[in-house]
Amino acid sequence: MTRTALYAGSFDPVTNGHLDVVRQACRLVDRLVIAIGVHPGKAPLFSAEERAALLTETCGPVAQAEGAALEIVTFNDLAVSAARRCGAAIFIRGLRDGTDLDYEMQLAGMNGAMAPEVQTVFLPASTQARPITATLVRQIAGMGGDVSPFVPAAVAARLRQRFAAHS
């Protein structure tokens, strides 16, 4: 039996924190589905297609090294619906701090009420990944700062290109 987990998020952009969670998750499951949330009304920096390509490029080798299959999908509805579609029995959620825990506990409770067959598993961020957020990465990159300590090299290059095009 294949153990499948869903890791949902915006991944705009993918960060070293996301890779940390992916690495940990791939040690626990046979198949990890990374689900990119696409929500009308939001204006992401990268399109869903660009985010999928960056996730494939950066997370693919991590999953392969850990012996897990990786799939990238998009969703525009509830994460529980995405989990059911891909046959996931586990929601993967990363935790950086107590603020994340409070929010994620509420989310886990709501998801558990809607999809009791899908268990939420919290993975603590490594010390190096704890301060990283995609929001801060976008802000730093947008102001011309060096984000290379916080994101994979391919993402840093795409951020430089994106913000160079806007200046």
From Swiss-Prot:
Q: What cofactor does this protein call for?
A: Mg(2+)
An example of a Pfam family matching this protein is: CTP_transf_like
Q: What Gene3D superfamilies does the entry give?
A: HUPs
Any one cellular-component term (Gene Ontology):
cytoplasm
- Chief subcellular location equals cytoplasm
Q: Which reaction does it catalyse?
A: (R)-4'-phosphopantetheine + ATP + H(+) = 3'-dephospho-CoA + diphosphate
Q: Which UniProt keywords apply?
A: ATP-binding, Coenzyme A biosynthesis, Cytoplasm, Magnesium, Nucleotide-binding, Nucleotidyltransferase, Transferase
EC number from the UniProt entry: 2.7.7.3
The UniProt site entry described as Transition state stabilizer is assigned to H18
One example of a Gene Ontology biological process annotation: coenzyme A biosynthetic process
Residues binding substrate are S10, K42, A79, R93
Gene Ontology molecular function, alphabetical: ATP binding; pantetheine-phosphate adenylyltransferase activity
Biological pathway = Cofactor biosynthesis; coenzyme A biosynthesis; CoA from (R)-pantothenate: step 4/5
The residues that the entry says bind ATP are S10, F11, H18, G94, L95, R96, E104, A129, R130, P131, I132, T133, A134, T135
Q: Where in the cell is it found?
A: Cytoplasm
Which cysteines form disulfides? none
Per the similarity annotation, which family is this? Belongs to the bacterial CoaD family.
Q: Which PANTHER family match?
A: PHOSPHOPANTETHEINE ADENYLYLTRANSFERASE
Assembly with partners or alone: Homohexamer.
Q: What does this chain do? A: Reversibly transfers an adenylyl group from ATP to 4'-phosphopantetheine, yielding dephospho-CoA (dPCoA) and pyrophosphate.
- This chain belongs to the protein called Phosphopantetheine adenylyltransferase
Q: Which organism is it from?
A: Methylobacterium radiotolerans (strain ATCC 27329 / DSM 1819 / JCM 2831 / NBRC 15690 / NCIMB 10815 / 0-1)
